[in-house]
């Protein structure tokens, strides 16, 4: 996201890892809170601009020391609010950082938001690769069919014990 913003693209990112949001930390926004703005008579959440990227995370609305203990429907509703109740403006790219796995958040996103493609990110540990494989298989399912446009291996230098 940051690289595309540096190249002049208009970029946003939704931190969809409801139970473990990391974007406030990664974008040096811990403790920040988005403002509410009025757009065409409707109150909207304004994503926070950092490093040229518009960022919206559940981490902006929760205490980082406390666990987010929500059932699937509540987590899904919070996710969809970050799309539907936010004023993103014109974007070239909107990234969605999903949690590992293939749970309620993934299903809500697939069913509610049109996706142009996914990039699967993993680390070389076997347990992480197993999650990545399941993610690939989910996005390839007949009732899902979201194109996989990339696979990134983070920490490729790391040798698991």
Regions found by a protein language model. Give the residues of each.
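Conserved catalytic-core segment of NTP-binding enzymes
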Residues: 92-93, 99-161
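Phosphate-binding/switch loop-helix module in NTP-utilizing enzymes
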Residues: 59-109
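Short acidic, glycine/serine/threonine-rich loops at helix termini
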Residues: 24-28, 67-68, 107, 132
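Hydrophobic alpha-helical packing residues
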Residues: 3-4, 139
